[in-house]
Amino acid sequence: MEREKKHFKLTDETINFNGKTLHRIEALVDIPCFAVSVGDLGGFLESYNNLCDNAWVGNEAKVYGNAVVTGNARIFGSAVVCDNAQVYGDACVYDSAIVSGYASISNNYRQGLLLFSRAALALIKRKRKR
């Protein structure tokens, strides 16, 4: 079976995050739908298995563990996808969102989690104190 040709490579730039060594990615092809060009740096992955198809991880976003981002999904900002989570289709996970456990996100479909921005969490906490 032929190995899937990847659209990115893991660079030598690494960070330690939650006890895992994550590598910054670099684009090997243009991905026009995300305004990514050959040579652009993206976010961080633990392994090649974390990212497939045309999906992209940008900025300081992190994907690790058995988590998989596929299809045309995009993870960016400071978002984290980990454990056994799956993000696929045309889904977008961004800002400080965390997708973990066995959560699954596809397009606008969410299963197994709620996503809140930090601003939304702060608002909820303020309302609870009243």
Regions found by a protein language model. Give the residues of each.
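Terminal amphipathic alpha-helical/low-complexity segments used for targeting or macromolecular assembly
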Residues: 1-53, 102, 107-130
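A detector of tandem-repeat and repeat-rich interaction/domain scaffolds
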Residues: 53-108
